[in-house]
Design a protein with these regions (language model features):
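A structural signal for multi-pass alpha-helical bundles of membrane permease subunits
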Residues: 29-330
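Short, Lys/Arg-rich, polar N-terminal cytosolic tail immediately upstream
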Residues: 1-28
Length: 330
């Protein structure tokens, strides 16, 4: 006896859903979007990519404004290694960066914490603290030139009230860079303060409430709630500070002209002197690309250390009993 095997009827192949025809309005909007995108892309190519390409070519020549131009290849880059003044400028820039970046972070975050309130006068203080950002460097430098005057400057007069003999800020090679750092922090912390304020206002209030109910003090709230919530914001601000520190020029140019004793000659200041002082455009272009690589490396290292992509993940760590683990994990 043979059994019959039932076979299921073959299914007809599914047809792909028919695509809806794109309306004329959608095509016009898409075309308009490309036109709007073409304008900034065109400006970026004309004013960024083309100059960078031309600078890359010039860096391989002995180009000068006056005279003939010859192809020298990598000679300009090899010359940098033996240029002792380049290492002096790089060391001064590194010193400036090591002082400016941490101080700029602390001042901007501290001011943002003080202004993250609902008082009536907060808006006034936010405006006042932002005024130096929109002021010209020459005006700011003039103010600080008088503030740092060794005899009659307000800063040294205030130090004298406490029996401290103020230094000769702009005339002492040990203090000139510190004076430039103080001026730069004062002139630029307003922008970073606004960025931190935006980050602070995005922190959920229930995290602070949970921490307070669990007995956390203000320092514990700041350490386990505020700082972890500002990881991305801190990464952005620190990156901007690093880039700005390596590109510092106008403060040193206006206040000290690179002195005393070349103690405030920065990388950009040195590039400016080589390009427009000595008219060595090829060598100045090579220095510019070396500076670009240095900034890129430090920015990547900063991104690696901060790891903004991991800020949203829950990470377990040991915390004091006064702070709930759910708050610390955020």
């Amino acid at each position: 006896m043979t059994g019959a095997v039932a076979t299921a009827p073959a299914r007809a192949p599914r047809r792909a859903p028919a695509q809806r025809p794109v309306s004329a309005t959608a095509r016009q909007m898409r075309r308009a979007g490309w036109w709007f995108l073409a304008v900034p892309l065109g400006l970026f190519v004309v004013f960024m990519l083309l100059p960078m390409g031309m600078a890359a070519v010039i860096s391989l020549t002995d180009y000068a404004i006056i005279g003939d131009t010859a192809w020298v290849g990598w000679e300009n880059y090899a010359r940098i290694w033996d240029d002792t003044f380049f290492w002096t400028a790089l060391r001064n820039t590194a010193r400036y960066t090591l002082m400016y970046v941490p101080l700029g972070l602390v001042v901007a975050l501290g001011t943002a914490l003080l202004l993250n309130r609902s008082y009536r006068a907060v808006r006034l203080f936010r405006t006042l603290f932002y005024i130096p950002v929109v002021s010209s460097t020459v005006a700011t430098a003039t103010i600080w030139y008088w503030l740092l005057n060794p005899q009659k400057g307000l800063l040294n007069v205030a130090l004298g009230w406490f029996g401290i003999d103020g230094p000769r800020w702009l005339y002492d090679s040990q203090w000139a860079m510190t004076a430039i750092v103080l001026m730069s922090v004062w002139a630029g912390f307003g922008t970073n303060m606004i960025i931190f304020l935006g980050g602070l206002q995005g922190v959920p209030g229930d995290l602070y409430e949970a921490a307070r109910l669990d007995g956390a003090n203000l320092w514990q709230q700041f350490r386990y709630v505020t700082l972890p919530s500002l990881t991305r914001t801190t990464f952005l601000v620190s990156t901007l500070l690093i880039i700005g520190a390596f590109q510092v020029f106008d403060q040193a140019y206006v206040l000290t002209k690179g002195g005393p004793g070349n103690s405030t000659v920065t990388m950009v200041y040195y590039i400016y002197n080589k390009g427009f002082g000595s008219l060595e455009m090829g060598y100045a272009s090579a220095l510019s690309f070396v500076l670009f690589l240095i900034i890129l490396v430090f920015s990547l290292v900063n991104a690696r250390l901060n790891r903004p992509g991991d800020s949203g993940r829950v990470r377990r760590r040991r915390v004091p009993a006064a702070v709930p683990s759910t708050v610390a994990a955020r």
